[in-house]
Amino acid sequence: SGPAQKQNVVNQLLVLIYLYKXDS
């Protein structure tokens, strides 16, 4: 539990935003 978990969450959020933007 540390920066690795936070980076994982940020990565997932980035992918979600990317998909959301691309979908529009």
Swiss-Prot record:
The answer to keyword Hydrolase applying to this record is no
Q: Where in the cell is it found?
A: Secreted, Extracellular space
An annotated Gene Ontology molecular function: oxygen carrier activity
Q: Which UniProt keywords apply?
A: Copper, Oxygen transport, Secreted, Transport
Cite the record's tissue specificity text. Hemolymph.
Gene Ontology cellular-component terms listed: extracellular region
Main function: Hemocyanins are copper-containing oxygen carriers occurring freely dissolved in the hemolymph of many mollusks and arthropods.
- Tell me its family: Belongs to the tyrosinase family. Hemocyanin subfamily.
The name under which this protein is listed is Hemocyanin subunit 4e
Q: Which organism is it from?
A: Maja squinado
